[in-house]
A protein has these predicted regions:
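Solvent-exposed alpha-helix faces
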Residues: 20-24, 79, 91, 154
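Conserved AMP-binding/adenylate-forming
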Residues: 8, 25-72
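Conserved AMP-binding A3 loop
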Residues: 9-13, 144-168
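Adenylate-forming
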Residues: 15, 19, 38, 55, ...
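Conserved pre-ATP/AMP-binding loop-to-beta segment of ANL
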Residues: 128-148, 155
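AMP-dependent adenylate-forming
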Residues: 1-11, 40, 113-116
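Structural core segment of the AMP-binding/adenylate-forming
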Residues: 57-127
Length: 169
């Protein structure tokens, strides 16, 4: 896996380990279970892919937030999807902080340095054992992740992406 913007390269083995560490953190620290929703506000990166597969390992649904939306619009999305946790890229710190303060969440995380009550992504992964969490078999109709979309006339609406859709693609 290559992030052309940062130049970071991650092998599939490292991707699997880091996704397992993220899954372990969510399970052990935030008590995330299958079906829980994890909202992520970040640019595409290798970390983003790790989070996507970390959610998949637990059966959690990753909510891919559109970073182009204003904070008030993002609040509407979070009110709709009711996430258990919020992860944001440090470049979206003001929005991430505003959203994390507006909702009761089991977990909060930023891709930068940890701070009071907010985990840092790299520090969180380093705390975990690194033991592989196997990805269980998923039914075709199980939701893997969710996007929000809207035209010019209305609020963003959730679009579910199932495991079956992923296999067809």
């Amino acid at each position: 896996l290559v992030d052309l913007h940062s130049g970071r390269r991650v092998s599939y083995s490292a991707l699997n380990e880091r996704a397992s560490r993220f899954a372990e953190y969510m399970r052990d620290r935030w008590h995330v279970q299958a079906g829980d929703r994890i909202a992520v506000l970040a640019h595409s990166s290798t970390d983003y892919v790790e989070m996507l597969y970390g959610c998949a390992k637990l059966g959690a649904v990753m909510i891919c937030l559109n970073w182009r939306l204003a904070v008030e619009e993002l609040k509407g999305v979070l009110e709709d999807c009711k996430p258990a946790a919020l992860v944001w890229g440090e470049e979206f710190d003001s929005a991430g902080l505003a959203l994390s303060e507006a909702f009761e969440l089991q977990g909060r995380m930023v891709t930068g340095a940890p701070r009071q009550g907010i985990a840092g992504y790299e520090a969180a992964l380093a705390e975990m054992s690194g033991a592989t969490i196997q990805m269980p078999w998923r039914r075709e109709d199980e939701v893997w992740y969710m996007l929000y979309t809207a035209g010019t006339t209305g609020k963003p609406k959730g679009v579910l992406q199932t495991w079956g859709m992923a296999h067809v693609n």
